A protein has these predicted regions:
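Glycine- and aromatic-enriched mobile tails/lids
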Residues: 1, 5, 22, 37-38, ...
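N-terminal Rossmann-like FAD-binding beta1-loop-alpha1 element of flavoenzymes
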Residues: 7-31
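Conserved redox-cofactor binding core of oxidoreductases
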Residues: 94-174, 186, 230-233, 253
């Protein structure tokens, strides 16, 4: 591994991969990931990815996104995401992503909660895996990209230029400083600090902890999304998501008596509240979701969900399955502008790590992959433009002036790493207090709705 790169990308989900693919091919790029390369939440996305089908859908797409976000979204970010969606989809298709098509070869669109029309492209019920695996395969072909798994970011290196690199802990446990012209944080959300989450457990908000110590601004850190339907289990570990597209295709929620009790296509936070109320009313630990009302062949439309439920003892073609809300997504994050720049020079953030305000207080279903791709590309293009303006020679000079940390600096770096470990403990304690987290978050939403029921938004 080199000590100097043009860019270091932390994370190899869709945001990290898309950024790497849009940086100059002559640039030296290092990508690191804390676990295996396929252990990103991007791989877990089931439902699909939104796209602006045609100009006539713009107003509705915009309104659906704003409405789901309680009108706390940043309008500019929403506009950029929607306007950029078709170009992103065309790129994905060019890179081999296989979206579902009809018998005439036309793209198929599905609908999910809080969408006023069908505008979501999908690949069975493993859309995230399809997109991320194809992008990752393209990244691995690039000779200018070094990809290291089981390599953890412990801190950033800062100086007169702002962010000047990252401190990493390699696979052998050694602390290594890596200098770079620019750094992109694309290392996911915070689900790992919750007991009940659909996220991988190693996603523990690393960038947020570092941002706090480095005075990099955060935004909307109290906005955590609870997904209404995960497969209920008494086992510990990551919760299996039952995609929103299941309800979009016609599945219904049932109480303990087998009666439907809510509108399944409301925004996620509203459906989660309704499920919680019903569980308290029925004195149960879950509600039921029936897929028998779906007119399609569910085994063919949702093969991954069918197989997983079968492994847990449920045949979705014959019986309802137990579902319960769980932590799913983080709308907050490291504050960025429309080019994914943080408040520290030469430091960018994209994907769930960042907060550009596009989701507001609650994310609209299937906007996450799209947002990650759109703003990762914008980060890469902004970096490339600045490199072109400055010239690679300047970067080479910067590399030559960068020096190894002295002994006292190494002690400081090691101390910072110890502080980082304390941060994890603090965050775990915070999550423990927030068992509050799942149900109190829903109760707070109830209180918010009650206090603002006469308030007009927009």
């Amino acid at each position: 591994m080199k000590k100097y790169y043009d860019a270091v990308i932390v994370g190899c989900g869709v945001a990290g991969c898309f950024a790497a693919l849009h940086l100059p091919k002559e640039a030296d790029i290092l990508m690191i990931t804390k676990a295996d390369t396929e252990d990103s939440d991007s791989f877990l996305a089931q439902g699909g990815i939104c796209v602006l089908k045609n100009e006539s859908d713009y107003d509705a797409f915009y309104e659906d996104t704003m409405h789901a976000g309680h009108y706390e979204n940043t309008p500019e970010s929403v506009d950029i995401m929607i306007r950029s969606s078709r170009n992103v989809i065309n790129q994905l298709i060019a890179w081999g992503v296989d979206f579902r098509r009809d018998e005439n070869g036309e793209l198929c669109y599905t609908k999910e909660g809080a969408h006023s029309t069908s505008r979501i492209l999908f690949h069975d019920d493993v859309t995230g895996k399809e997109i991320t695996s194809k992008l990752l395969a393209q990244v691995k072909k690039l000779p200018n990209v070094t990809l290291l798994a089981h390599t953890e970011m412990c801190d950033i290196l800062s100086g007169k230029n702002g962010c000047e690199g990252v401190l990493i802990r390699d696979e052998e446990g050694k602390l290594v400083p890596v200098y770079a012209r620019d750094v992109i944080w694309a290392c996911g959300g915070i689900g790992g600090i919750y007991d009940n989450s659909t996220n991988f457990p190693h996603l523990t908000g690393d960038a947020l902890a570092i941002a706090i110590h480095r005075n990099v601004a955060l935004k909307n850190v109290n906005y955590v999304q609870i997904h209404p339907t995960t497969l209920y289990s008494q086992k510990k570990g990551r919760r299996f998501l039952i995609s929103e597209s299941v309800r979009g295709e016609g599945a219904v929620l049932l109480d303990k008596n087998g009666e439907r009790f809510t509108d399944e296509l409301q925004p996620r936070d509203m459906v989660s509240r309704e499920i919680h109320r019903q569980m308290e009313k029925d004195h149960t630990k879950h509600v039921w979701l029936s897929l028998k009302t779906i007119p399609l062949d569910v085994k063919e439309r949702f093969p991954n969900i069918y197989q997983k439920c079968l492994e847990e003892g449920y045949d979705i073609t014959k019986e309802p399955i137990p579902v319960v809300p769980a932590q799913h997504y983080f709308m907050g994050g490291v504050k960025v502008d429309s080019n994914s720049e943080t408040t520290m020079d030469h430091l960018y953030a994209a994907g769930e790590t960042s907060c550009n305000g596009v989701h507001g207080a609650n994310r609209l279903a299937s906007n996450s992959l799209l947002e990650s791709l759109v703003f990762a590309e914008r980060a890469a293009k902004k970096m490339a433009a600045e490199w072109a303006a400055e010239g690679l020679v300047e970067n080479a000079d910067r590399k030559e002036t960068a020096t190894e940390p002295k002994e006292d600096e190494w002690k400081l770096l090691a101390k910072r790493y110890d502080i980082r470990k304390e941060d994890y403990q603090d965050m775990e304690e915070y999550a423990e207090r927030c068992k509050e987290s799942i149900w109190d978050a829903i109760r707070k939403e109830d209180k918010y709705e009650s206090n603002h029921k006469n308030t007009k938004c927009g």
